[in-house]
C-alpha cells in the first residue's frame, strides 16, 4: 500500500520479488535521460521575488518545452552565442521569456539588456507576447489530433540532444495515444521501448501508437533499426480450463478450476475473505499449438491483468509483465502440439486491507501505520485481481 506521499519499497509488499523488472526499467530510462543536454526552446526566468515557484500547470503553448532560469545562472553563467542563449554545459535556448513581474532588481534589468544587445531574443510580457516570438521558431513537436496548451496528460515529451542525435522521451496518458506525431528533426527515426527492449524503425509524421501510460524513446540520428512487424494474426488456441491455486492461511481455497477467467473478487463460491485475497496465486493450463508461418514470431497476450504476471511456458521462465501491454514474445518457448502455460499473478495489498478494516481488530492479518492517512474508507469496494483476459496467441509476421 502507498499513501499521498509515495509508495514504500519494502520486502513486505506483495510485489517485492518482482521489483527487479520495474527498477531495471527505471534504470534504463534514467540512463538515457541523463545523457546529453536538454534541447528546449524557451528559458523561463523565474523572477527576483522570494519564493518564486513556477506554475507547473501554466498554459504553455503546445508543441514547445521550457526550462527554468534563476537569478544566479542569469547573472553568472548565461551567455549568447550565434543568437542562442547558452551555458557552459552545452545546452542552448532560442528565447528567454520574462513574464510580467511586479518586482525586478536593477542588476537583472541590466543583465537582460546586455543579453539582448548580444543578439539574444528576450521576450517581456505574458503568454501572447511569447506566442508571437515562438511563431518564428516553429514547434518542436506537433500532434494530430492537436493538443491544447498547458500540461496535457494525453501526450507528454522531453527532448535531449546527445551528440548529433536528437532523443525524445514520449509518454502517453492513462487513455493511451494513437495519432500522428511530427518532430522538428529530419532523418531516419527509431522507436525504443525500454520495457520490452524492442527497437524498430519509424517515419517522422506517421502514427505513433502507445498503450495507456506507456513511454518510449524516439531517436533521430542514432542506431538504425529494422521495420516493425505489423502483420498480426491470431492463432486458434483454447486456453481453458484453468487451475488456480492459492497459498494456505489467507482464506482462499488451495485449488479451484475455472472454465473462464474472471477476477478473484467475482469467483462463484468464494467467501468474502477469499475474494479479498492479496498476494500471489498461480494459474496453469494446457493448449495445443499448430504453428505459424515461417519466420513469424509468436506473442502471448494475457489481456487484462491485475496487477503483475510472471509467465512460464513449458517449464521455462519467459518474462515478468508489470504494465500494459501484458504480452510477451514466446517464439523460443512454444512448440507444436501440447504446451503447458503457468502464470504467477500478484495483486496489491489493497483488497485485504479493505476486508480487514471491516473485521474485529483481533482477527485482522494486516495493519497500517498512520491509519487515518493511508487506509481506504470502510465501504470501499474491492478492486479486480488476477487474470481477466482474454488470453490469446498471435503470429507476428513482416508486412
Located regions from the model:
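Carbohydrate-binding surfaces of carbohydrate-active enzymes
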Residues: 1-280, 288-292, 330, 392-395, ...
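Short, hydrophobic/aromatic-enriched beta-strand segments in well-ordered soluble domains
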Residues: 216-222, 285, 341-347
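Glycine/proline-rich low-complexity spacer/linker segments in large multi-domain proteins
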Residues: 223-244, 347-393
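Beta-strand/loop-rich accessory regions of lumenal/periplasmic or secreted enzymes
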Residues: 263-269, 273, 304, 321, ...
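Aromatic-lined ligand-binding clefts that engage carbohydrates, nucleic acids, or primary amines
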Residues: 287-314, 341-345
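Short, surface-exposed tryptophan/glycine-enriched loops
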Residues: 288, 328-340, 344-349, 354, ...
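A beta-strand/beta-hairpin structural motif
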Residues: 322-326
Amino acid at each position: 500500500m502507498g499513501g499521498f506521499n509515495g509508495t514504500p519499497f519494502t520486502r513486505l509488499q506483495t510485489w517485492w520479488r518482482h521489483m527487479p523488472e520495474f527498477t531495471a526499467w527505471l534504470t534504463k530510462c534514467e540512463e538515457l535521460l541523463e545523457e546529453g543536454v536538454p534541447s528546449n526552446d524557451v528559458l523561463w526566468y523565474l523572477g527576483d521575488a522570494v519564493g518564486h515557484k513556477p506554475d507547473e500547470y501554466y498554459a504553455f503553448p503546445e508543441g514547445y518545452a521550457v526550462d527554468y532560469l534563476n537569478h544566479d545562472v542569469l547573472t553568472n553563467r548565461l551567455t549568447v552565442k550565434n543568437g542562442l542563449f547558452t551555458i557552459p554545459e552545452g545546452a542552448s535556448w532560442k528565447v528567454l521569456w520574462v513574464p510580467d513581474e511586479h518586482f525586478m532588481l536593477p542588476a537583472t534589468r541590466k543583465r537582460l539588456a546586455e543579453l539582448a544587445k548580444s543578439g539574444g531574443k528576450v521576450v517581456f510580457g505574458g503568454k501572447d507576447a511569447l506566442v508571437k516570438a515562438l511563431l518564428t521558431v516553429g514547434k518542436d513537436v506537433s500532434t494530430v489530433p492537436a493538443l491544447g496548451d498547458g500540461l496535457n496528460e494525453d501526450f507528454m515529451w522531453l527532448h535531449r540532444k546527445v551528440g548529433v542525435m536528437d532523443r525524445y522521451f514520449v509518454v502517453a496518458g492513462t487513455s493511451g495515444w494513437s495519432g500522428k506525431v511530427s518532430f522538428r528533426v529530419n532523418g531516419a527515426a527509431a522507436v525504443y521501448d525500454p520495457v520490452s527492449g524492442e527497437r524498430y524503425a519509424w517515419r517522422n509524421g506517421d502514427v505513433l501508437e502507445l498503450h495507456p501510460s506507456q513511454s518510449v524513446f524516439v531517436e533521430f540520428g542514432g542506431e538504425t533499426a529494422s521495420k516493425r512487424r505489423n502483420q498480426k494474426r491470431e492463432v486458434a488456441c483454447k486456453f481453458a480450463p484453468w487451475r488456480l491455486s492459492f497459498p494456505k492461511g489467507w482464506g482462499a481455497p488451495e485449488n479451484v478450476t475455472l472454465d473462464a477467467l474472471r477476477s478473484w473478487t467475482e469467483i462463484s463460491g468464494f467467501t468474502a475473505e477469499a475474494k479479498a485475497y492479496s498476494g500471489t496465486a498461480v494459474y496453469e493450463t494446457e493448449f495445443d499449438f499448430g504453428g505459424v508461418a515461417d519466420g513469424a514470431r509468436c506473442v502471448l497476450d494475457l489481456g487484462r491483468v491485475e496487477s503483475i504476471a510472471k509467465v512460464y511456458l513449458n517449464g521455462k521462465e519467459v518474462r515478468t509483465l508489470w504494465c500494459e501491454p501484458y504480452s510477451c514474445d514466446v517464439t523460443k518457448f512454444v512448440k507444436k502440439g501440447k504446451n503447458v502455460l503457468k502464470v504467477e499473478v500478484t495483486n496489491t495489498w489493497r483488497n485485504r486491507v479493505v476486508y480487514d478494516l471491516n473485521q474485529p481488530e483481533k482477527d485482522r492479518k494486516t495493519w497500517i501505520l498512520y491509519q487515518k492517512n493511508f487506509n481506504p474508507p470502510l465501504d470501499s469496494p474491492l478492486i479486480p485481481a488476477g487474470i481477466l483476459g482474454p488470453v490469446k496467441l498471435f503470429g507476428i509476421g513482416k508486412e
